[in-house]
């Protein structure tokens, strides 16, 4: 059946940057109208950090846009529930491994939900797919891509795979020449990696053709992705830090085992730095998602993450979050102005969404999102709408402001922002102010919003902001030169 929505033609215009080829390319799924996507998920031994949040939100945004275009998306994100770090943490805590992993799986789901992320269609756990991992290892050994060491470990022989390094653009000979890696006794090459680890006392273990043991990390994703999506699928994603060695090793394992291309497109989310430095527990700049959401509204965190292109490197700081909070507030304020003038609460339905995408500004939004999921440019389109709403409201053009507000909220729903009732969001802001959590930048942002409200003759909102700030101990002084403030 032919699609008749404004997005009917847009489906074929999507381009995605492929990390393997190093260029943007037209997206052509294996099956018409369907997308299989696998994203490397979390190793569940601790609370998720802000880098995990970027992966969660980035691929949630991609899934939502693919679905908006009309694709039937099968989104798979695995859970690594057996790993050295998990074993170590459980031992440190004196906790059963299953209890530890379930606790952090639950926390991960809570964080993802708070950030407005859809649940994956499938969420395979490594420990549920040991058989598939063993079968893939057996195939690799049989075809001379892997070998068993005398110590009971099984290794992948990187020399056996001619294309090793094609994703990360690394040459194996150059890597070996510059390597300071000491060759383990049972390895033929220092870059050979473990597929099966021989059992150690007091560690989880499974019976295998090579003795008791457990799988290596890399084979887990190869086996689970193939089980859920087949030998070849459309999109494989994860954080940029996984490109080498994890994703490189996945390609080597999977393509050697199946003889098929592994993934048609590779997407990698950029790093997050904290105040210009790499996030690290040793530097004391490590923040969990919960740390951040204790200080900022979850929608503010989502907005911050979407405000940069998913592949770009992002600097995380209080000032950046404050700026995102202020920006999001201004978008909500534009909706509030339109609602107050119209005397109605704005509710979006499918017809309004179609109207929004059929508009000129909707076409700009489509163009941005179809350019490798460029949410940053798409958000700039939303700000253009907000400015036009304020202009129309100031001119008392109620119907134009209302139509533009419909477009704003309808387009924003694809990014899953601006979907709260306006008053609910503003009440949450009041709660933040009451807790005296505002930085100088946040106060300045509210003062700018108050000035905008006055310009648009929305004196009720201007007074509301003054009261909010007063309750937080902030005194305002208005003069012809502008507004100054001080903490009482």
Curated annotation (Swiss-Prot):
Its EC number is 6.1.1.16. This is Cysteine--tRNA ligase. The keyword Cytoplasm applies. One of its GO terms (molecular function) is ATP binding. A motif ('KMSKS' region) lies at residues 278-282. Its cofactor is Zn(2+). Keywords: Aminoacyl-tRNA synthetase, ATP-binding, Cytoplasm, Ligase, Metal-binding, Nucleotide-binding, Protein biosynthesis, Zinc. CDD domains: Anticodon_Ia_Cys, CysRS_core. The keyword Nucleotide-binding applies. Disulfide bonds: none annotated. HAMAP family: Cys_tRNA_synth. A motif ('HIGH' region) lies at residues 42-52. ATP binds at residue 281. One of its GO terms (biological process) is cysteinyl-tRNA aminoacylation. InterPro entries: Cys-tRNA-ligase, Cys-tRNA-synt_Ia_DALR, Cys-tRNA/MSH_ligase, CysS_C, Rossmann-like_a/b/a_fold, tRNA-synt_1_cat_dom, tRNAsynth_Ia_anticodon-bd. It catalyses: tRNA(Cys) + L-cysteine + ATP = L-cysteinyl-tRNA(Cys) + AMP + diphosphate. Its main location: cytoplasm. It comes from Psychrobacter cryohalolentis (strain ATCC BAA-1226 / DSM 17306 / VKM B-2378 / K5). Binds 1 zinc ion per subunit. It is found in: Cytoplasm.
């Amino acid at each position: 059946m032919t699609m008749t929505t404004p997005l009917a033609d847009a489906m074929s215009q999507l381009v995605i940057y492929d990390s393997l080829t190093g260029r943007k390319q037209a997206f052509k799924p294996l099956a018409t109208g369907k997308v299989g996507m696998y994203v490397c998920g979390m190793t569940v031994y601790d609370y998720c950090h802000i880098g995990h949040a970027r992966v969660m939100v980035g691929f949630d945004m991609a899934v939502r846009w693919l679905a908006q275009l009309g694709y039937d998306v099968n989104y798979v994100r695995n859970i690594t529930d057996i790993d050295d770090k998990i074993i170590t943490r459980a031992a440190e805590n004196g906790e059963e491994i299953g209890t530890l992993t379930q606790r952090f799986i639950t926390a991960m789901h809570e964080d993802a939900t708070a950030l407005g992320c859809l649940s994956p269609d499938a969420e395979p756990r490594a420990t549920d797919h040991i058989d598939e991992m063993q079968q893939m290892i057996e195939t690799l050994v049989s075809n001379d891509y892997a070998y068993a060491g005398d110590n009971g470990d099984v290794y992948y022989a990187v020399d056996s795979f001619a294309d090793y390094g094609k994703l990360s653009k690394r040459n194996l000979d150059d890597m070996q020449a510059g390597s300071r890696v000491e060759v383990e006794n049972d390895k033929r090459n220092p870059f050979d990696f473990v597929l099966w680890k021989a059992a150690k006392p007091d560690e989880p273990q499974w019976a295998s053709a090579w003795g008791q043991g457990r799988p290596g990390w890399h084979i887990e994703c190869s086996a689970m992705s193939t089980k859920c999506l087949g030998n070849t699928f459309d999109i494989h994603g994860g954080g940029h830090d996984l490109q080498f060695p994890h994703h490189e090793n996945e390609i080597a394992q999977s393509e050697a085992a199946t003889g098929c291309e592994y993934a048609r497109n590779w997407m990698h989310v950029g790093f997050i730095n904290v105040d210009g430095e790499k996030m690290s527990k040793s530097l004391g700049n490590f923040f969990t998602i919960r740390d951040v959401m204790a200080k900022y509204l979850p929608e503010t965190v989502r907005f911050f993450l979407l405000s940069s292109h998913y592949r770009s490197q992002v600097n995380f700081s209080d000032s950046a979050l404050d700026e995102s909070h202020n920006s999001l507030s201004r978008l909500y304020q534009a909706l509030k102005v339109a609602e107050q003038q119209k005397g109605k609460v704005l509710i979006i339905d499918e017809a309004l969404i179609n109207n929004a995408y059929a508009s000129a500004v909707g076409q700009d939004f489509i163009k941005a999102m179809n350019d490798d999921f460029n949410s940053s440019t798409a958000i700039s389109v939303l700000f253009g709408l907000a400015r036009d709403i304020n202009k129309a409201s100031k001119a008392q053009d109620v119907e134009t402001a209302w139509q533009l507000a419909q477009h704003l909220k309808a387009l924003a729903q694809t990014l899953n922002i601006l979907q709260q009732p306006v008053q609910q969001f503003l009440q949450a802001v009041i709660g933040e102010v009451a807790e005296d959590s505002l930085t100088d930048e946040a106060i300045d942002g509210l003062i700018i919003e108050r000035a905008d409200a006055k310009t648009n003759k929305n004196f009720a909102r201007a007074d509301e902001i003054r009261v909010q700030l007063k309750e937080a101990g902030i005194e305002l002084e208005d003069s012809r030169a502008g507004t100054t403030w001080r903490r009482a």
